[in-house]
Every structure is written in C-alpha cells, then in structure tokens.
C-alpha cells in the first residue's frame, strides 16, 4: 500500500527519565510536591522518523510508571502497528490489559504513546499536528493554571498578572486551604488584580467536602467564578449532585 511504502511501521520505542527537584515546593489541597519525574517515550518508524510523547509524573510511583511503559513497549513491538493506528493500538492494549484495570498507569502509558505516535505521523507527512486535527479554528481559548496554595499573596498576584500580560483570558486558582477565609481572600485579591473581564476558575483537587464546597461557592459567587473543578472526590457522584442542588 501507499502507506506501507513510506515506512510507517513502528520499529522501536525508547523510554527516558529525568528527575528534578523544585527550587521551591508547591502544594494544592491534596498534594505537596518537592520534586518531579519526567518521562519521554520516543517512537521510531521504519523510515527513521522519531516521535516523542512526554509524561509529567511528579514523584509518584516512578518504578510502576516505568514498568507500565515497558509493558506497553513489549506489547507494541511484538506486533506490527503503523504510527497512524492510534485507536486500534489503544483498543488492542485495553483488551489485553483489562484484567489489571484500564484507568491509572495503563492509561498514562497509552496517552504518552498516543502523543508520540501523532508526532511521528505528523513528521512523516511533513505537517504540524494541528493540520492533522482538521484546522477548523484559527484560535482556541486557553487559561493560565497555577495559583498554588503554597504561594504567598505576592507570588499569587505576580503570577496572575503575568498571565494577563501574556494575553490569557482566564486563570485557575487552587483552593482547599485549611482556613477557608484564606481561599476567599485570595480569590478577592485575584479579581481585584486582574479586573472584571478575565475569567477565574477554582480547583480543589478533590480535597474538600460538600459543606465546605457549598460554603466557598456562596462566599465567592459574586466574583464571577467560571467553574469549580474537583471540589470533592471524583467518584462522589452524590456529593456533586448535592453541591449542584445547594448552589445557584
């Protein structure tokens, strides 16, 4: 086939890891992060094209994550996949690894490989990836994420003003401090600093309960909060329904 002639079969996969300590630890409502582990998964086609996917895994279970990537590598190289067969490869591997559970480490490894395959396919065709996705938009909205709970007020405001200066239309701030008054005060400070036109989102990283979530929403809704991300555990469907029911 024409595709076969341009040598798109996956010939090899390589895994690299780097670990770095942060100059200053950061924290959200559920995590304290002092160092990060960073993985690169590289795919090589029979035509010699390289594609890379990146995984930021912070410092969690590096051996398990690397093991999941090595298991996936063995699976892929024992078969003949073209770099554009992203969906088929994912479906095959999910069927293969279903016994151990699809979410979690398996999905992390698959996602990193998926990015590497798209990269290799785009490089094979000599096109940027966004063209392969259809190119239907000239612009997409993006937001600046950060606002870590560990930030001082000065650091928080410096960050959101920098996002505004760079042209971001929205910022996302961490909430879920032990002292809710601090969350409320920080959100007020952000709104004062960036003015009325930028969107503000807040993210508790699943670190709050229903009463504290409802209380926070009521105290800051006049600030025009665009969304509230992960107030409670992502499997607490009843909790989310209650939060929705108790707030406007």
Show where each model-derived region lies:
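Structured beta-strand/loop patches that form or line metal/cofactor-binding pockets in enzymes
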Residues: 4-58
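Conserved, mostly hydrophobic/aromatic
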Residues: 10, 41, 48, 113, ...
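Metal- or metallocofactor-binding catalytic centers and their adjacent structured scaffolds
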Residues: 12, 44-124
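N-terminal small/glycine-rich loop or linker at the start of catalytic domains
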Residues: 125-150, 186, 193-197
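Active-site mouth loops of central-metabolism enzymes
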Residues: 140-155, 204-210
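Short, acidic/polar
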Residues: 151-163, 211-216
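Catalytic domains of carbohydrate-active enzymes, especially glycoside hydrolases
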Residues: 162-174
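Catalytic core of soluble alpha/beta enzymes
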Residues: 173, 178-248
